[in-house]
Amino acid sequence: MSLSVEAKAKIVSEFGRGENDSGSTEVQVALLTAQINHLQGHFAEHKKDHHSRRGLLRMVSQRRKLLDYLKRKDVARYAALIERLGLRR
């Protein structure tokens, strides 16, 4: 259910400020978004998997908190990230 090492490395290099920047808010949000999108396909097939659905809701909540933090700290980076990820906000 998790992302492959290659997929994570690609996201880190795309959204990170440096090559090994895996801790910035943008990278964390991008990784959570990729995992959320991956799980949405899982739930199309496994509708009664409530255990994984709880994990999905936790990821969505964590992403929401990180986006709120980024919006408070730097609105320009927040808007750019929302645009790059294609999130609704």
Swiss-Prot record:
Belongs to the universal ribosomal protein uS15 family. One of its GO terms (molecular function) is structural constituent of ribosome. It comes from the Bacteria. This is Small ribosomal subunit protein uS15. SMART domains: Ribosomal_S15. GO terms for biological process: translation. One of the primary rRNA binding proteins, it binds directly to 16S rRNA where it helps nucleate assembly of the platform of the 30S subunit by binding and bridging several RNA helices of the 16S rRNA. Forms an intersubunit bridge (bridge B4) with the 23S rRNA of the 50S subunit in the ribosome. It holds the Pfam family Ribosomal_S15. Part of the 30S ribosomal subunit. Forms a bridge to the 50S subunit in the 70S ribosome, contacting the 23S rRNA. The keyword Acetylation does not apply. The keyword Ribonucleoprotein applies. GO terms for cellular component: cytosolic small ribosomal subunit. Keywords: Ribonucleoprotein, Ribosomal protein, RNA-binding, rRNA-binding. SUPFAM superfamilies: S15/NS1 RNA-binding domain.
